[in-house]
């Protein structure tokens, strides 16, 4: 997952 602001 690369769409999360903390990921």
Curated annotation (Swiss-Prot):
GO CC term (a single one): extracellular region
Residue positions, PTM Valine amide: 7
Alphabetical GO biological process terms: defense response; positive regulation of smooth muscle contraction
Entry keywords, A to Z: Amidation, Amphibian defense peptide, Pyrrolidone carboxylic acid, Secreted
Sequence positions bearing Pyrrolidone carboxylic acid: 1
Localization, UniProt: Secreted
Tissue-specificity statement: Expressed by the skin dorsal glands.
Domain of life: Eukaryota
Family: Belongs to the frog skin active peptide (FSAP) family. Peroniin subfamily.
Role description: Induces contraction of intestinal smooth muscle in isolated guinea pig ileum.
Protein name: Peroniin-1.4
Species of the source: Litoria peronii (Emerald spotted tree frog)
